[in-house]
């Protein structure tokens, strides 16, 4: 498998996994569980999708690391402004603990999948087996969030287990991506700005969800302009090549996943893709978003 085929498969897998695993952050069932622990409810909806409360998001995902302080959570998440993450986590741990919110996270994620897909959707046992095999024996070095999911108990139902294994692979690619952009010499603001343009979004739009103030965004744009990566609010050829190199480096780190799936790759995609469409149609995950790299690279919709 050459690098081009690897990238196409790695991005396609990431795209079909994203709504299935990532729906945990938009699940009304999760939000309700977090309210029971003392967090605020979902602050708003966007196109019918319930957005997460900030402290609940940081603590629920951060619970994969155990009772981790805010600085550690900010380090692992990498792209968020630590000055927002740290107090949010400090508040969260004043009202609950990692074990309680991790249980709420798991229960809420599975509950939404059951509500939308049913308790035993077609093909889920095959997906469970394939993703379980692919997600169990990956190296944990430099992969803190993947290692955190790996340490969690696997739910007993095929649907719950498939979600857990998909969450492992989602975090594995996320950890790999962090390694790719940090080793390429970018900071969180710079990679966020480059990524907006790479996705075809205007500057200073999506990155605002990462809580960076305007002054830091402006400084980041200036640094990218000085490196001839951005000019007049658009990527230069060098900027596009640099950002694509980050994505390709991420893909290469996912080679063990693709090789482990082997001949089951197409089956996993064929089962998960319609599930993802149904999750989005039922407002369990944003209907469109930044996780469409696979279709862009392969030149086809998923």
Residue ranges and their predicted role:
Residues 1-218, 287-302:
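Phosphate/adenylate-binding glycine loop and adjacent helical scaffold
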Residues 210-287, 293:
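Accessory, usually C-terminal, subdomains that scaffold auxiliary metal cofactors
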